[in-house]
Amino acid sequence: KILTLPGTPMGDFGLLFGPRIREKGLELRFSFFSTNKGRRMPSIAAGIGGIRGLQLRLNPAARNLVLSYDETNLKKVPFLWVDAQWWEVRFQMTPEGSCSSTNVKLKLWPLKENEPRAWLVNEKFDIEYKGGKCALWGFPYASTPIAFDNLLILSR
């Protein structure tokens, strides 16, 4: 089954899913598909640790990915998204030491290609690891549907 967000009405739409897991590292995997319409492009986001937890947001119009925590931007990475193809995401959050810092890893690649060996992001941040549920958001700025598939949560 594929979870599809229609292109209208325009707005931001999200869902929390999976078990509330604390004190263990989490990996969220999923794939998504969407298209642009003229110069308008959709945006997607995924989170670990609930709505205010660690979030990645793909901003195709700005050609970047943004990692944020509790609405504070942590890192911006240049990224060129191509529409009309499935994309695969691996997003990991692992506590370090006494959970006072967190190691974050991220991969994003076209599904028709092999998974890259290197992580797009592999960095330690001074944010407290709390764990929690996972989240997905869709922002259909292009007025075209956004599809999510192959949702998988792994605990470490």
Model-derived regions, located:
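Short, aromatic/His-centered strand-loop micro-motif at the edge of beta-sheets
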Residues: 67-90
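Surface-exposed coil/turn segments at beta-strand junctions on protein surfaces, enriched
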Residues: 8, 21-23, 80-84, 99, ...
